[in-house]
Curated annotation (Swiss-Prot):
Record keywords: Actin-binding, Cytoplasm, Cytoskeleton
Signal peptide per UniProt: none
Protein name: Probable actin-related protein 2/3 complex subunit 3
Function of the molecule: Functions as a component of the Arp2/3 complex which is involved in regulation of actin polymerization and together with an activating nucleation-promoting factor (NPF) mediates the formation of branched actin networks.
Gene Ontology biological process terms in this record: Arp2/3 complex-mediated actin nucleation; epithelial cell migration; morphogenesis of embryonic epithelium; regulation of actin filament polymerization
One GO MF term attached to the UniProt entry: actin binding
Quaternary state and interactors: Component of the Arp2/3 complex.
Subcellular location per the Swiss-Prot or TrEMBL entry: Cytoplasm, Cytoskeleton
GO cellular component: Arp2/3 protein complex; cytoplasm; striated muscle dense body
PANTHER family noted in UniProt: ARP2/3 COMPLEX 21 KD SUBUNIT
UniProt organism field: Caenorhabditis elegans
Length: 183
């Protein structure tokens, strides 16, 4: 069974994110940032939908810039689930994920700690790096908000075990941050 790839590589002309090979895709969001707005399904919906089946793959063929963005989101969802393991309810989970989204400890492509630097083109200039940081921060904030809605069917209860069971899995045998690093 092949991995699920992003439909945005074939359906949409994907804008490059600065001078890198990641895609700058439109998203549905209320958070401020450089991402174009849309009212339709976006890369975040796709990443959340394909997270569970794709997390089991050790290899993933990148077919375009939208796939690179989706890979980053899958890595980030895993970090979010690790954070949610300690959350007693939805409000605490939202606070934890908002703090994680704004964290400067999360590496971006081109930095030393990023796990797939060989497959991602680093930003060539400071404006490209700033645009990438702002875009990734915006999608991290949005994915945290949507993941809380999915992981907490009851806002007063702990997160769903059907999401938390994936917190220990490692996509492509890698993680966004090294093992043992607490965010």
């Amino acid at each position: 069974m092949p991995a699920y790839h992003s439909k945005f590589d074939t359906e949409l002309k994907v804008l490059p994110l600065g001078n890198t090979n990641m895609g700058k895709l439109p998203i549905r969001t209320n958070f401020k940032g450089p991402a174009p707005q849309t009212n339709q399904d976006d890369i975040i919906d796709e990443a959340l939908t394909y997270f569970k089946p794709n997390i089991f793959f050790r290899e993933f063929e990148i077919k375009g810039p939208a796939d690179r963005t989706m890979i980053y989101l899958i890595f980030y969802i895993t970090e979010c689930l690790r954070k949610l393991q300690k959350s007693p309810n939805k409000i605490a989970g939202q606070k934890d994920l908002h703090a994680l989204a704004l964290s400067h400890l999360l590496p971006i492509p081109g930095e030393n700690g990023f796990p797939l630097n060989s497959m991602y083109k680093a930003p060539q200039s400071k404006p490209d790096e700033d645009e990438m940081r702002a875009y990734l921060q915006q999608i991290r904030q949005e994915i945290g908000a949507r993941l809380c809605d999915l992981a907490f069917p009851d806002p007063q209860d702990r997160p769903s075990k059907w999401w938390l069971c994936f917190a220990r899995r490692r996509f492509m045998d890698k993680g966004l941050v090294g093992q043992g690093v607490n965010l």
